[in-house]
Amino acid sequence: FNSAIGPYKGGLRFHPTVNQSILKFLGFEQVFKNSLTGLPIGGGKGGSNFDPKGKSDREVMAFCQSFMTELCKYIGADTDVPAGDIGVGGREIGYLFGQYKRVRDLYEGVLTGKGLTYGGSLIRTEATGYGVVYILNELMKDHNDSLDGKTVVVTGSGNVAIYAVQKATQLGAKVVAMCDSNGYIHDPNGINLDVVKDIKEVKRGRIKEYADRVEGATYTEGVGIW
């Protein structure tokens, strides 16, 4: 969208709602987000209305490879550096980066969010979720307060939400609810993050499974968490 102060930088989104209008606004928004970091990076956004949900690993890999075969003509370490977003996690980034190397025969900083074994950054997975909570905690300090002892609700159950829950818990809060696009769970005893990770990261399931596995937890279908 804008590269006035550096190469384009922003996430790739794979979700059925993706269209040109959404990506244009997200790219516009990314310009300001990146500018506020003080780093020499511009803003951009990309993606597809491909939905990884319900697809096999082979199907996701095939799409990522086809997508990168075209995208690789327009990106590079000093031109445009995509990252992950909704629907594009470590698995998808790995497939995309593998195809980039295969087509361009280059091993450079062309995608962020890669695994540690092929050039990724330590704690990249946790960074966004942790950042949300650190900023919230700093805001509360301005009001002579902190997260310690607070009851917290977190929207989502993907990568950002999982690590926001983890950091909030480490800072003394009790997270009692999370959600996905189908509904939300409530656990008055505090969310068991190991169970959530197993459901979302290992089995790639839906958050409603949490209520079947944790005593005292409930699931509400078709209602927003707020």
What are these model-predicted stretches?
Residues 1-25, 29-32, 40, 49-50, ...:
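Generic N-terminal targeting/processing segments that precede catalytic cores or assembly contacts
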Residues 1-3, 43-48, 87-88, 158, ...:
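Glycine-rich beta-alpha junction loops
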Residues 3, 7-9, 31-36, 43, ...:
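Residue-level signal for pocket-adjacent positions within structured domains
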Residues 4, 40, 72-73, 166-168:
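A general structural signal for short secondary-structure junctions and capping/turn motifs
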Residues 15, 32-148:
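Glycine/serine-rich phosphate-binding loop and adjoining beta1-alpha1 elements at the start
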Residues 22, 59, 91-95, 195, ...:
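Exposed alpha-helical structural elements
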Residues 26, 70, 95-99, 198-202, ...:
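Residues that form generic nucleotide/phosphate-binding pockets
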Residues 112-115, 120-225:
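Glycine-rich phosphate/diphosphate-binding loop of Rossmann-like nucleotide-binding domains
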